[in-house]
Amino acid sequence: MINTPVPGLAPSPAPQKATLHPQAVQVRADQPADPHAMLGAFEQLLGGYALDAESVEAAEPIALVVGTSGSTGTPKRTALTAGALAASATATENFFEANADAASQWLLALPAHYIAGAQVLARSVLAGTAPVIARSVIEPVHFSPEVFLQAVEQMSLARRFISLVPTQLHKLLESADTDPHLGAEIHEALGSFTGILLGGAPASADLLAAAQELGLNVVTTYGSAETAGGCVYSGSVLPGVRVELVPEEGMPAVPDTEGKPAHDESVQVGRIWISGAHLASGYIGDTARTAEHFFTSADGTRWYRTDDYGLLSPVAAPDSNENCSEPRLQVLGRSDDVLISGGVKISARAVATVLEEHPAVREACVVGLPDARWGTAIAAAVTLVPSAISDSASTVLNEELCALLRARCTEKLGAPAAPKQLSILPDFPLTSTGKPDRAEIYSILDRDYRQG
């Protein structure tokens, strides 16, 4: 039986095709969408909304269907109403303290067929401003510093925002470090944004520290298509959103900053459940999946059961020993990121975090490989920072670095967490959104592990 945050929750029914709005936008991860066409559709679909979450109607038709290709699992089609999109946009605007005298302008640098890109268009419609669309979104060119700077030059309002994935921000900052002239332009352009939303994948501590050192207002986001985009910003739950953590059997031990299990009674650990007007209606034509993830309480409140484990901890008030009323959410990783090696539960996210703490490591990706002895062998791929790449051709130095990384994992997380396979890659293969391609990385690690 599934534990729930509210007793007596009932599974929600799956939305059917008949509930689609005549002008509903349907997108798929493997089929790039035309942002201009989507913008026109959103203008019609969201025309009756202001930046006001109170206008949500539960029975309204579906406005946006976000589909996956199924390359990493069974395809799903997440259905969102116009009201859910409006509720999410309102929460974002309120987070940045909406100013009636200063309109917001967005730069679209992510594909429109992903929820983060679609939300940039929805927020623009609700703000009443035209978004700037980067060339990399509509032309067969990659996101680059030059593409970014060209797009920023087209922005006309002072209150400006952008959504990026960590790989994109890393590319911009790395280019700035290697080219002083270009670097000044990049820093100035990034610094002109009121807010830089960073999501889609975990951002490393080094990347966030570099952004903070430059004075950039980077906000890490947590959310998905099921929540109409980000609903937790830099650990803070957005207005109108409710988050509960429900303990479950089989969760990995949660390390604190010293690498030891956390026992603080004020800290909650469990599967993340989310409620709010921004939730999706469910999965079109998929009753089983909808019933597994969406629930409705007796009072009509709907909940989304995520695939993620999290930690809610109180935040100390400035200059005080007392905690603030609003706790901070830390995402520990997906439930399917819990690997069992030799009978020990290990968090893939925790291993990646420890690897990325080493100054030579730029980013890490951790997976589990089938193994006759261990059941699952912990495997990790890492890329290196520029200063370490010059020595990467040395087999001896690579072996020494891998030994150090394994030792760090053993020290902080225990011997079972030390990767059995550790591969140093020049760069991670990327998906169309600029995220590390986990399926391709898995194939590389599996090949390396089998070759011994």
What are the roles of these predicted feature ranges?
Residues A82-S88, Q105-K171, V219:
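AMP-binding/adenylate-forming
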Residues M251-F295, I346:
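Conserved ATP/PPi-binding loop(s) of AMP-dependent carboxylate-activating enzymes
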